Amino acid sequence: MDYSLTVLLPKTDFPMKANLPQREPHWIEVWEKEKVYSTLLEKRKNCPQFILHDGPPFANGKAHMGSGLNKILKDIVLKSRNMLGFQCPYIPGWDCHGLPIEHKVMSEYPALAADPLSIRNKCKEYARYWIEIQKEQFRRLGILGSWDNPYITMDPGYEAAELRLFAELVEKKWVYRGLRPVFWSVGCRTALAEAEIEYQKKEDIAIYVEFPVGEEELKKAGLPQGTSFLAWTTTPWTLPANLALAVSPDLSYELRQVGGKKFIVAGKLAESIPGFSHSVVLLSFPSGQNLEGLKYNHPLLPREGVVYTADFVSGETGSGIVHIAPGHGMEDYQLGMVHGLEVYSPVDDQGRFTKQCGIEKIVGLSVFEANSILCAMLKEKGLLWAKYPYVHDYPFCWRSKTPIIFRSVPQWFIAIEAFKSLALKEIERVNWIPSRGENRIKGAVESRKDWCISRQRYWGVPIPAFYKKSGEAILDPSIIRRFADKVEEEGTDLWFRLESKELCQLLGLAPSEDLVKGLDTLDVWIDSGSSHYSVLKPRGEDPADLYLEGSDQHRGWFQSSLLLSVASKGKAPYKSVLTHGFVVDLDGKKLSKSSGARDLSEQIQTYGADLLRLWVASEEYAEDVPFSKEIFSRLSDSYRLIRNSLRILLGNLHDFNPQEQSLPDDRLREIDRYFELCVNKLVKKTKAFYENYEFSQVYQALTRFCSVELSSFYIDILKDRLYCDGQNWLSRRSAQTVLYRTFECLVKLLAPILPFTTEEAWRASGKTSSIHLELFPEEREIKEEEKLLKRWEKILQLRDLANRELEKARKQKMIGKNLEAKLILFTDDFEAEDTALLTEVFLVSQLEIIRSSKTEILVEKALGKKCPRCWKFSLFAQSNSDPQYPHVCPRCLKVLKGLPESFLVSD
């Protein structure tokens, strides 16, 4: 007889092969058809809210793996918070204005350069196109949210709210217009924010320049003829704008003779200056303060400058003397403000010298082209002491990839310095994950100067300012609010469409030939940074519970949002901030769109969204996250383990109706009650990991449970009961009761990470509604839990000992499989009544307990004959001469003859 036909093998429609790229789209359609997102919001309407505010990605090109990492992390947070009993509305957003899009449009349509409205229309089309592409990519990841109603920074409603926030800042006197140095992109011809700067290695010319002391000053100070200040600079092109020299009040200075020349330099730096190794000290000055007020002659132009002290002068490099050009450096500017120096910047928006520079040879040249000419002029005058190549970190424009310059032009600023201390206090009130994020953003804010918010571009929200012919600016909160009301109806194109007179009339200003509308637009960091005001505030969700972005956003969105929120309402816009690293290759190099990063859609098509999500969950997201085929090969093994665990559970529940056939706790077998403790432990720690955003710990806990507790331990032990006991025996239903509870717990705990796989398994179990509407499982109360745990601690120790002894017997060829063995257990911890339990747990055919104070296990060959149905050895099987079922064991004979479980057949 073929006894294999009589055992109850697992059956399930849940396939072993996942085919994720092919199967996953079906579930997206199901979620759409069943309106799972809106149903979930309704189901949790009486629950506390948890608001994760989406940082808007830029609507420019396909989403890359870094974007995928970010969105998956957010969705894991939201799904887990939903299952923890929160209502979690998710409003995705897109950032649309700014240089990258305008730069792209201008390169494709150069003929539109003089037509602002046409440029803006093309920019809108471009942004809308990529929003739809990215939206589908993100939805394909299994992310639930308000995809049909996202927030988009170029929408009129959003722009209007942004302008109303701007009006508040103007009203609070945080906004001013000033002439001061700003980061200037020559490639894009606009001012840039600090967050739009990328530092790269750049080779420049470093020079030591002589600034001769004037004749009158020599006499006043008692200095010898031919004395010069020797200054070091890596930007020779700024020399035409030199108006002062700076020395340190904390350094001592010396007058040194080198050959026929005499130089004033910092004493501690003298020996490091080229050619100074044999210099002679003529005079000493205890402090830079002894030099303050001295005048010098400009090395290239017929004018004088004055020496001032400044704390920023370093004693680490150079000569201890810094040349000051207030129009081309922030520290220079600030020193100039103290001493009433002109903010002088003879450079146009293309980075070329104007006639104002006073040096005919360099007029019309770019500042970098002028370097060599200026050096040649200095050399010709005998005022170039040394020149050499110098490699340093230099700021570049993030979009044009060209080196930026500091240039002074009239711009609009937010007075960060005025409320910086409050912003720093708010940083301390926020929960930063990981904690090092606090110091990172603190450092960024502490060093932050006033924020240049005006841009000389068309594609952005216009600054609704008017200018008189005299240059006086009119920026009035009431006018801004009126304009915002109009923008809500018509959009910001209105500003570019109407003439100045029409705008004046529309906004309640008396039309005048003297008033001209401004053409500057707001920095795009104002766009995204005002999202707490534009999106959260109207929904009553401000402050958000969580902002979650890459670590670069300490300089970007986290900071702009913080500063605008503190400026408008005195508080941070978020309670917690979580940051993740960059996606990198195996060499640790960052992947990004512009450098040809792997396309997100391509990876979804290769691996499936669930495997990408498992990758995100498995990594320590706070660090840079490696991405490679090797990593995904290992992850595939983990995924197969999880999927196979779900399949085993489903397969062994094919004939189980939990509503009708579940057993109460007091009728469960002891091992089943113990395994419920294991499941309880998993539930408790996994929920805690989710709450604390420790997703790699979730991954490790769940994969370990599937591999060790479930597959290697529990399922291995249960197979005999599940396959060979009678279908409706209580022993089998006890196992199935706990397997069902295990399935429900495991599939729910996996759901935030593997939404597609768990949905498929959930529906395969007979459920008709989405798993994503469920809550996480609660821990079950288990009778005499501590006593049970202590007892099973001993059982598992014995199991380890038994396995070691069985392995020895196997190596000695005494046995093959465990079922060929009989164990003699010497112990005083267990009684004869535990024999059946320990036999089952140790996976042997027979076991005998002998009372002994010394714990020991002996292995013998099992007695009797192997049952052809269950493969256990039995004396009964040896003597069983049943005409229909000869040589089967007592248990199998009862099953085959349809006898009740309680019927006694003696072995």
Curated annotation (Swiss-Prot):
Domain of life: Bacteria
Matching Pfam families: Anticodon_1, tRNA-synt_1
Gene Ontology cellular component list: cytosol
Class of this enzyme: ligase
Cofactor comment text: Binds 1 zinc ion per subunit.
One GO molecular-function entry: ATP binding
Binding site for ATP: K593
Matches recorded under SUPFAM superfamilies: Anticodon-binding domain of a subclass of class I aminoacyl-tRNA synthetases, Nucleotidylyl transferase, ValRS/IleRS/LeuRS editing domain
Residue ranges of the TM segments: none
Positions contributing to L-isoleucyl-5'-AMP binding: E549
A GO biological-process term: isoleucyl-tRNA aminoacylation
Keyword ATP-binding: yes
Subunit relationships: Monomer.
UniProt domain comment: IleRS has two distinct active sites: one for aminoacylation and one for editing. The misactivated valine is translocated from the active site to the editing site, which sterically excludes the correctly activated isoleucine. The single editing site contains two valyl binding pockets, one specific for each substrate (Val-AMP or Val-tRNA(Ile)).
Protein name in UniProt: Isoleucine--tRNA ligase
Species for this entry: Methylacidiphilum infernorum (isolate V4)
Gene transcribed to yield this protein: ileS
